[in-house]
């Protein structure tokens, strides 16, 4: 019976096969809503990243055969973290569009002074904005947004393979999301803004008509 002999290259390949995808997934979880806030412990995020890595491992494909302690390995690690953080910011910007819409509605309604602490970012936000954020989070989970996120992660390893340089198209796509965020916020807030503006116009018009009568009495 022959003994099992493992070479250094094979061990390094096994380590890289799971470690580099985990860095990308952990970068995503550190920024995205729900998981990226301070209320979720770091150990929980790392454990969840390890679990998701095991689930997606069959779909990741081959990774470069690089020594984990080399400079090339450090560059690949930094690249994976950067990709994960960028993906997390894309998801975060979608939720920020909802927050921005809530702030616009609160200011229009005159409720901008009613503030509460946002546990996600640790800042004071209008209550209406926080309500919108909670509803967006519940809709995200109810509509299986977390399933779509797993599909996005799996697809990212095909579009942006581990170890390959980032193309200009991928970076430009992420940058274009800034404009999409503001347009999305306007689309979400527009019905409430139009309603409040109509109420304000009617109120001002009614006050303008009744004030002369009051002063003449």
Task: Give the positions of each predicted feature.
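Hydrophobic alpha-helical segments and their helix-loop boundaries in membrane
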Residues: 1-209, 213-216
């Amino acid at each position: 019976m022959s003994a099992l002999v493992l070479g250094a290259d094979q061990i390094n390949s096994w380590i890289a096969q799971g470690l580099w995808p985990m860095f990308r997934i952990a970068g995503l979880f550190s920024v995205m809503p729900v998981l990226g806030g301070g209320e979720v412990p770091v150990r929980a995020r790392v454990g969840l990243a390890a679990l998701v890595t095991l689930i997606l491992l069959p779909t990741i494909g081959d990774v470069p055969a690089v020594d984990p302690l080399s400079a090339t390995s450090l560059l690949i690690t930094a690249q994976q973290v950067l990709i994960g953080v960028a993906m997390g910011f894309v998801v975060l910007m979608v939720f920020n569009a909802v927050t921005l819409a809530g702030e616009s509605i609160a200011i229009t309604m005159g409720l901008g002074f009613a503030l509460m602490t946002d546990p996600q970012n640790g800042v004071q936000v209008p209550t209406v904005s926080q309500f919108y954020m909670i509803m967006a989070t519940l809709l995200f989970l109810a509509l299986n947004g977390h399933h779509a996120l797993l599909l996005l992660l799996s697809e990212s390893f095909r579009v942006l393979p581990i170890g390959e340089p980032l193309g200009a198209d991928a970076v430009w796509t992420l940058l274009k999301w800034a404009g999409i965020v503001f347009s999305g916020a306007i689309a979400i807030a527009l019905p409430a803004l139009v309603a409040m503006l109509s109420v304000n116009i009617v109120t001002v018009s009614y006050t303008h008509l009744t004030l002369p009568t009051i002063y003449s009495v």
